Amino acid sequence: MSKNFIVLDVEGYSTCKPYNIGYIVGNKSGEILSGKSFALMPAVWDNIQYKIKTMNVDGLASAHEMAHNNIKEILCTDNEKYTKVFDNHKFFGEFLTDITKYDIKRVWAYNCTFDKGALTRLFTEEQNTIVNNLVTFCDIIPAILYTKLLNKEYIEWCKKNGYLTAKGNVQTKAEVVYRYLTGNLEFVEEHTGLADCKIEYEILLNAMKETKSPRRTPCQAWKIIQKFCECEGIDIPALDNK
């Protein structure tokens, strides 16, 4: 199997086509062979419309703020941070070219169900078939969960630093995991495709250093951690509130 793989991150509402897609081509040694960030202009308006329609929906405030900042940056700057494409077929062409050029067999993403779903909405049926015949989508969450997070140290660290959900579950989002792995409690995820890819790549490399075959099937990390706590007698609020 090819030693190269893609780490991909998309930005956009879960019911819309993504307005920003970033990905890097790398390998287990930490070498980044390519990095790209695309602003998909046809999808920008779709996401703006969705934001307007759901302004008063509970639970979407942070998503709205993130979309507002990202789209504002895309529309108001001419810097080289994004490659603006006005035809989704152009992105598909570049993505397919890199898959072929670097002999990619696996595409990794943090919570890959979301990212793969976004690509499915973006691509035509034929394009989806082509991509799915060439690569397997893999989830970074189980890879890092079973190598670095499913232990008392991580759970106690989350409790100490307040990284629990409103229901008391241990958080496993990329920003929190990256803070844990690096010791940098001030780190803030940028929430743009290429920037997030870079930290997710580092997270994946941490998992790959621990095992030759990291787990890659999507899972409910919070539930697995909760079950681990029950078995190990670790006290967390989620267990107290049953």
Describe the function of each predicted region:
Residues G12-S14, P142, I199:
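Short, glycine/acidic-enriched loop or turn micro-motifs at the edges of active sites
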Residues F38-M41, N132-L149:
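A short, structured active-site edge motif that brings together acidic residues
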Residues Y102-C112, G117-A118, K159-A238:
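Acidic, Mg2+-coordinating catalytic module of metal-dependent nucleases/exonucleases
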Residues T113-F137:
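Substrate-recognition/cap helix-loop segment adjacent to the acidic, metal-dependent catalytic center
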Residues S2-T120:
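Conserved non-catalytic scaffold segment of RNase H-like nuclease domains
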Residues D78-Y82, E126-V131, N184-E190:
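Short, polar/flexible loop-turn hinges at active-site or ligand-entry regions and domain interfaces
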Residues D240-K242:
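Acidic catalytic cores of enzymes that act on phosphate-bearing nucleotides/polynucleotides
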Residues N47-Q49, K53-K72, C76, I141-C197:
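Active-site-proximal helix-loop-helix substrate-binding element of RNase H-like nuclease domains
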